[in-house]
């Protein structure tokens, strides 16, 4: 629990330009941490086999229909783009007047319901588009409260996803202070700066998630063995460093070269975001084909890899037991 005095010290006045969105958060935020800001516990713990668990992460799940489609396709984690608006948090990638999907509260209710019905949904990755937004009570505290009231009691863990450019903001500093055993923090970017950010902020290795990718990784894939900026190289360096609890790549679509998909998996990524490049998730033959590609590699390597289940804890170094 973080003290109110310490929390207020994070929230110094100053205008915050919201990245990737025309929305501007007001200066001088005033966030209050609820008194019942606790860590729900509804997680099972059962050792699996020694094969490494792999997360198949549905991309841009912005509607309740997208939740149902992704879980029906076999996704075991969901990536939800999150944008704050004056009237609430929404599943929204672009932050435009016509781009919002469902309210986050409704999305979380749907995910929790599916999890309680037996769906394999290990965690929700919150891709935070304007994490420092703060208006009408819509701020990072209210978002985390939704996670802890709706997702976590159902057994769904949470990944708070930031970009390297957002790590100096109020939201990042708040989240890192109050992470519970069901939550982790992710930074997307290049390996070396991300590793330095995590070290500087004193975040435990098992709570660190490094991600690297491109809307089409083929455009800057690299050789996987070079020291350049290619996506595959960044992922390989992240895994070999042992500086992160998990390493995820993105975005695999029906247009991604099959050999590139396989190479990302061969360097040891713990999961891949898959789906459409520029649209929200829904049932479509292209998405189903992408899943077949990823699962094809898993089938060929079943002695060493398997799809993660709800019993696998992504925020544990062993990945097989709850914290």
From Swiss-Prot:
Keyword Lipid metabolism attached: yes
Residues annotated as catalytic: 59
Motif SMD-tail: where in chain: 308-315
Main location: secreted
GO biological process, one term: lipid catabolic process
Comment on bound cofactor: Binds 1 Mg(2+) ion per subunit.
Signal peptide (residue range): 1-20
GO molecular function: metal ion binding; sphingomyelin phosphodiesterase D activity
UniProt-listed Enzyme Commission number(s): 3.1.4.41
Known cofactor(s): Mg(2+)
Keyword Magnesium assigned: yes
Function: Catalyzes the hydrolysis of sphingomyelin. Sphingomyelinases D are produced by some spider in their venoms, but also by arthropods such as ticks, or pathogenic bacteria and fungi. They might play a role in pathogenicity through different mechanisms, such as membrane destabilization and host cell penetration, but also pulmonary inflammation and cutaneous lesions.
Family: Belongs to the sphingomyelinase D/phospholipase D family.
This protein's name: Sphingomyelinase D
Organism: Trichophyton rubrum (strain ATCC MYA-4607 / CBS 118892)
């Amino acid at each position: 629990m973080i003290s109110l005095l310490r929390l207020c010290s994070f929230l110094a006045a100053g205008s915050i330009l919201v990245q990737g969105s025309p929305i501007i958060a007001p200066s001088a935020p005033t966030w209050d941490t609820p008194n019942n800001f606790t860590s729900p516990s509804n997680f099972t713990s059962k050792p699996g086999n020694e094969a490494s668990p792999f997360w198949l992460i549905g991309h841009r799940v912005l509607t309740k229909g997208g939740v149902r489609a992704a879980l029906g396709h076999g996704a075991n984690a969901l990536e939800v783009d999150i944008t704050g608006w004056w009237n609430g948090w929404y599943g929204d990638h672009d932050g435009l007047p016509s781009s919002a999907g469902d309210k986050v509260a409704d999305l979380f209710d749907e995910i929790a319901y599916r999890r309680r019905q037996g769906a394999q949904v290990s965690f929700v990755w919150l891709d935070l588009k304007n994490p420092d937004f703060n208006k009408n009570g819509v701020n990072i505290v209210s978002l985390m409260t939704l996670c802890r009231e709706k997702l976590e009691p159902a057994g769904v863990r949470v990944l708070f996803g930031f970009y390297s450019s957002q790590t100096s903001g109020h939201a990042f500093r708040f989240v890192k202070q109050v992470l519970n055993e069901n939550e982790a923090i992710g930074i997307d970017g290049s390996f070396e700066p991300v590793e330095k950010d995590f070290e500087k902020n004193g975040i435990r290795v098992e709570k660190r998630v490094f991600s690297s990718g491109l809307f089409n990784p083929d455009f800057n894939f690299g050789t996987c063995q070079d020291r350049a900026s290619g996506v595959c190289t960044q992922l390989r360096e992240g895994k070999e460093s042992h500086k992160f609890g998990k390493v995820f790549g993105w975005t695999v679509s029906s247009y991604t070269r099959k050999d590139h998909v396989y190479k990302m998996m061969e360097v040891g990524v713990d999961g891949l975001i898959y789906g459409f490049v520029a649209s929200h998730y829904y049932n479509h033959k292209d998405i189903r084909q992408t899943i077949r590609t990823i699962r094809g590699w898993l089938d060929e390597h079943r002695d060493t890899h398997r799809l993660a289940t709800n019993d696998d804890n992504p925020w544990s170094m062993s990945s097989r037991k709850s914290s």
